[in-house]
């Protein structure tokens, strides 16, 4: 998608409040990708993305900015926690798995796009498969009259199938079952083995299953995709997308920084993870199920709160690979108020829509919203700062009784005012010990 940095920031403003610096830096980084692709192949190889380090406490919008952009622009995106690589008992276990995860994300992205493009062909394939079970083909040598009758019956059945009249009927279908797909705990390295067994024709089998037609339609989608779509071109496109448009968001990078003031036995492990990350961020080749993926032009966005450490506590080589740094602002009551009112699908709108399913119209008056924001802000100041996530806890506590008794208010309008907010939350926020457990 060809968007200017200003257009990117404008899009983000609908979902993330404030954080202008972070939005600007990411918008420029993404626009530079588009600019790079307009250059000659020789020059493209030399221009590497400027990786970004985002510094800010939890709940201020670090992940949301990157996730929203990747989704809007159709980029392969994954989020991983750097800290998980120190929890396994030995240094840097499978740090390359983040690249394999990105390859899978790119593959799914391209597959979904191709399925959408070829929707009519896929639907026709599924339709014919189901019709074969409902009305088996006639044997050879049947009279023209019988063939005409069969054709008419088939078209009537097809119309019923398309209209959903047969959705609750039960049929027996054959679906392919791969032995690798049945075990979700197999490591990502098995992707290459999966491709080999497909070629030699083992590892998968046809399984007969009885199910409703509406379920059969979904079950046959994968088989239809395998038969109709060009799998090699999908892999090739996915590899290209992952290499040139992929974004890896490394959260909690501060947890693997070795604080100069805090030396403990985990420090060698933390530094080991940093050194394992280094070649991937610098640019290396990683074997994935879609081929050898070069990480040279993947955009890495690292993020952390850095409460107990500083960015300078990362090893110098890794610091140098994240030249763009941006500090995200903490959220005060004004920012929290905007978060509750401005975004397209704000938290208050979500709760209103949920209760609308119970035929209850829920509204919040402006003073009540300001009071909710103040209480959330105060809770963040007096306890751990968890940013906008505090709003979820506060609103859940506020609406707890109403959600429980929603059926009693069916057909009515319920307005949350400042008085209700003070009654429900005032005593809790004043009692700090209680607030720590509830808010």
Curated annotation (Swiss-Prot):
User: What UniProt keywords are attached to this protein's entry?
Assistant: ATP-binding, Chaperone, Cytoplasm, Nucleotide-binding, Stress response
One GO molecular function term?
ATP binding
Entry keyword annotation includes Cytoplasm: yes
Residues binding ATP are 17, 59-64, 251, 317, 389
Q: Looking at the record's lineage, which domain of life comes first?
A: Bacteria
Localization terms from the record: Cytoplasm
Set out the biological process GO terms recorded for this chain's protein: protein unfolding; proteolysis involved in protein catabolic process
PANTHER family in the cross-refs: ATP-DEPENDENT CLP PROTEASE ATP-BINDING SUBUNIT CLPX-LIKE, MITOCHONDRIAL-RELATED, ATP-DEPENDENT PROTEASE ATPASE SUBUNIT HSLU
Quaternary state and interactors? A double ring-shaped homohexamer of HslV is capped on each side by a ring-shaped HslU homohexamer. The assembly of the HslU/HslV complex is dependent on binding of ATP.
Give the UniProt family note.
Belongs to the ClpX chaperone family. HslU subfamily.
**What name goes with this protein?**
ATP-dependent protease ATPase subunit HslU
Source organism of this protein record: Campylobacter jejuni subsp. jejuni serotype O:23/36 (strain 81-176)
State the encoding gene.
Answer: hslU
């Amino acid at each position: 998608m060809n968007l200017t940095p200003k257009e990117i920031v404008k899009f983000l403003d609908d979902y993330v409040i404030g954080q202008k610096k972070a939005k600007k830096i990411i918008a420029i980084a993404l626009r530079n990708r588009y600019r790079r692709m307009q250059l000659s192949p020789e020059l493209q190889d030399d221009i590497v993305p400027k990786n970004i380090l985002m510094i800010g406490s939890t709940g201020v919008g670090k992940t949301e900015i990157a996730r929203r952009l990747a989704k809007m622009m159709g980029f392969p995106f994954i989020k991983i926690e750097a800290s998980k690589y120190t929890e396994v008992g030995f240094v840097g276990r499978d740090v390359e798995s983040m690249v394999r995860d990105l390859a899978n994300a790119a593959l799914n992205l391209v597959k979904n796009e191709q399925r959408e493009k070829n929707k009519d062909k896929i639907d026709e394939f599924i339709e014919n498969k189901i019709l074969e079970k409902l009305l088996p083909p006639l044997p050879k040598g049947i009279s023209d009259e019988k063939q005409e009758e069969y054709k008419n019956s088939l078209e009537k059945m097809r119309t019923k199938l398309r209209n959903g009249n047969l959705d609750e009927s039960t049929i027996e279908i054959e679906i392919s079952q791969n032995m690798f797909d049945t075990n979700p705990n197999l490591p990502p390295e098995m992707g290459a083995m999966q491709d080999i067994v497909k070629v030699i024709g083992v590892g998968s089998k046809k399984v007969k299953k009885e199910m409703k037609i509406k379920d059969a339609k979904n079950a046959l989608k994968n088989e239809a995709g395998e038969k109709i779509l060009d799998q090699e071109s999908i892999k090739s496109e996915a590899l290209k997308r992952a290499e040139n448009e992929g974004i890896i968001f490394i959260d909690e990078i501060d947890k693997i920084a070795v604080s100069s003031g805090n030396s403990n036995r985990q420090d060698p492990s933390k530094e080991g993870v940093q050194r394992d990350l280094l070649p991937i961020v610098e640019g290396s080749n990683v074997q994935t199920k879609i081929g050898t993926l070069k990480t040279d032009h993947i955009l890495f966005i690292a993020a952390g709160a850095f409460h107990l450490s500083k960015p300078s506590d990362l090893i110098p080589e890794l610091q140098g690979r994240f030249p763009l740094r941006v500090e995200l602002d903490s959220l005060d009551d004004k920012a929290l108020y905007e978060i509750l009112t401005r975004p397209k699908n704000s938290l208050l709108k979500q709760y209103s829509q949920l209760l609308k399913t119970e035929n209850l119209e829920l509204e919040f008056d402006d003073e009540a919203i300001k009071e909710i924001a103040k209480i959330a802000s105060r809770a963040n100041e007096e306890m751990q700062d968890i940013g906008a996530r505090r709003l979820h806890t506060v609103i859940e506590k506020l609406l707890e009784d109403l959600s429980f008794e929603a059926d009693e208010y069916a057909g009515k309008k319920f307005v949350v005012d400042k008085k209700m907010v003070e009654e429900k939350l005032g005593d809790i926020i004043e009692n700090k010990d209680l607030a720590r457990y509830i808010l």
